[in-house]
């Protein structure tokens, strides 16, 4: 007898904008408030979260959306229906500046894109070569340096118009060589050159990726942003709770390396969505808006490659 009455009371309170279902969901599924686990990066360029790609739509993405479109749900008359909106922030979220014939020293490179070793397992290129290729660094001399630099797979040194190039992710701060081979010989040459205090000049194309600060500011102005597990139980539970509250929300999967999470956008101009956001924040659900702000601060304070 009491359960139906409690249910009716909950529905009554939801009708007046109290997020009862959402509160119950957060109590029953604490996994929704798990912190955003960053991938183990080491010295791998492929483990850097590709925030510059967040606005792009991949060929295999679902739901199929045109550039700048975001899928959402909200009340529509007596129904709770899906809708699609165009948010220009996602057409300009990431930026890439390309510099041809860019120069640096081998010591400026802090990570690589490809190696036979697991690049995510090492804190530095020195640690990788010490662990897996000690023979390559046994001869700390100009001869040992020249031998490693002569390796044909270091394409930046031995190819005309090589595919290898430099990449700098402004929110990460490190410079990477996006290589197709020669990782251990490159790291060994870098190791030896540092101990000989000998410069090794490099030249190639630099691609500098950054997050558009205005796009982030616009999203944060219009929405409270959170990240939840991209799992059926969590996503369906949140959807049902928002439907019970009749509050709108938008969602979008996060970039590569964070593909186990999805972003939730709660409109700041809708009182019910604002109440839902306050409850998510109170429960400790990951604040994606704050995280993006931190990335921009890191991006602004990181020295760009010269």
Where are these regions (language model features)?
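Charge-dense polyanion-binding interfaces
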Residues: 199-226
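Short alpha-helix boundary/capping and kink motifs at helix termini
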Residues: 16-176
């Amino acid at each position: 007898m009491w359960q139906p009455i409690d249910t009716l009371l909950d529905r009554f309170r939801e009708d007046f904008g109290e997020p009862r279902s959402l509160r119950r969901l957060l109590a029953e599924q604490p996994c929704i408030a798990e912190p955003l686990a960053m991938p183990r990066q080491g010295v791998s360029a492929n483990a850097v979260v590709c925030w510059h790609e967040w606005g792009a739509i991949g060929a295999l993405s679902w739901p199929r959306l045109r550039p700048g479109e975001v899928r959402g749900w909200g009340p529509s008359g007596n129904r709770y229906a899906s809708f699609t909106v165009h948010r220009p922030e996602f057409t300009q979220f990431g930026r890439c500046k390309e510099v041809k014939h860019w120069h640096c020293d081998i010591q400026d490179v802090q990570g690589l894109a490809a190696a036979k070793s697991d690049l995510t397992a090492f804190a530095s290129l020195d640690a990788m070569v010490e662990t897996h290729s000690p023979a390559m660094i046994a001869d700390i001399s100009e001869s040992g340096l020249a031998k490693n630099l002569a390796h044909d797979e270091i394409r930046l040194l031995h190819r005309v118009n090589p595919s290898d190039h430099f990449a700098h992710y402004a929110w990460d701060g490190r410079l990477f060589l996006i290589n197709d081979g020669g990782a251990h010989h490159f790291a060994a040459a870098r190791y030896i050159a540092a101990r000989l205090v000998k410069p090794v000049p490099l030249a190639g194309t630099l691609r500098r990726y950054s997050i558009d600060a205005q796009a982030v500011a616009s999203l944060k102005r219009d929405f409270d942003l959170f990240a939840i597990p991209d799992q059926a139980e969590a996503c369906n539970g949140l959807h049902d709770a928002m439907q019970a509250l009749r509050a709108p929300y938008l969602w979008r999967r996060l970039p590569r390396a964070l593909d186990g999470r999805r972003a939730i956008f709660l409109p700041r101009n809708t009182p019910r969505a604002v109440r839902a956001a306050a409850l998510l924040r109170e429960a400790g659900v990951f604040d994606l808006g704050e995280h993006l702000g931190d990335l921009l601060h890191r991006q602004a304070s990181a020295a760009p490659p010269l």
